[in-house]
Amino acid sequence: MTLLRRAITVPLFTVLMIGLLAVWPLLLVIGGVAGLIGRSSLPVRTLGVVMAYALLELRALWQLLSGGQNCDQFMRDLLERGYTVGRRTLNIGVLLDGASPTPEQIPREEPMIVLSRHCGPGDTLLVAWLLGIHYRLQLRIVLKALLRCEPVLDLAGDLGCLCFLRHRHKHARKQIHDLAASLGSGQALLLFPEGGNFTWRRWRTAVIRLRSSGRLREARRAWRQSHTLPPRTGGTAAALSGAPSASVLVLTHTGFSPDGRARAWWRLPMNRRLLIRTVLVPAAQLPPPDQLSPWLQQTWSIVDAWVADHADAESVVQ
């Protein structure tokens, strides 16, 4: 199945990226005219992002197919280049809350489990940049299996940088457990306890699911917390059981939408900073396994409240 998928996606993406670069001058003219008519730089900037993505995709594919890549060096290179593209084309970046720990305060002797909010396409790149470049952690990221259709992510999974969850429940938890157990000092596992990107549809579905299963208290809590999805304990529990000595870094961010919630994938952010807050929870302060679920629920209540308080914060750059 893997070979068949790659036999389709790698040539397809390669031809598509080369085709985009070939018609770049024509697209630039069209984008420039559209920008003049609409008095907006968005068309040209959007084309800039598309062209930069094509170049990054081709370069990364060439590196991966050539072999001999180091997982951590490849990730650092990809994150640095992706962040540079976002900063130069869209003028977006990261603004770290002053209460967050500094890189020097992050423990290096033991592995780290990062529990991050998930809201908006592209936000994950900036979150990963903060962890991998600013905090200098060697990242391992848990993703949905659907993302293996993107050939760079698919091939990077062979390096051990990424873990694609093939199944739900027990099989997925075992994957997370095994990955966490393999972590060494200075390495971090990035998890998204909400299980997916925040959307209004997923939020409503989650509330209805909790109500229909008789978990009325959790349903009321989820209804009040309208900036986040209810966190799922399974992945976090699996990670902590695999790495019992790991500390936890809780990562919250405002997203790029003015209300801190969902943003349509085609609406590129411009001239904005992603406000991020991180909270370090040492391993000694983590609850026992039987208390993990209420701890995570309470933690996510704090996450939701922080987003609600800071969503309208001044993050627009003129």
Show which residues each predicted segment covers:
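A Trp-anchored, charged/polar loop motif used as the substrate-binding/catalytic surface
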Residues: 170-181
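Conserved glycosyltransferase catalytic-site signature
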Residues: 124, 176, 232-236
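Membrane-anchoring hydrophobic helices of lipid-metabolizing enzymes
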Residues: 1-112, 126
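A cross-family acyltransferase "interaction/gating" segment
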Residues: 133, 137, 145-160, 184-290
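Accessory terminal regions of nucleic-acid processing enzymes
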Residues: 287-318
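Short acidic-hydrophobic, aromatic-tinged amphipathic segments that line or gate anion-handling sites
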Residues: 97, 162-167, 280-282
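Catalytic core of membrane glycerolipid acyltransferases/transacylases, capturing the structured
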Residues: 56-81, 108-169
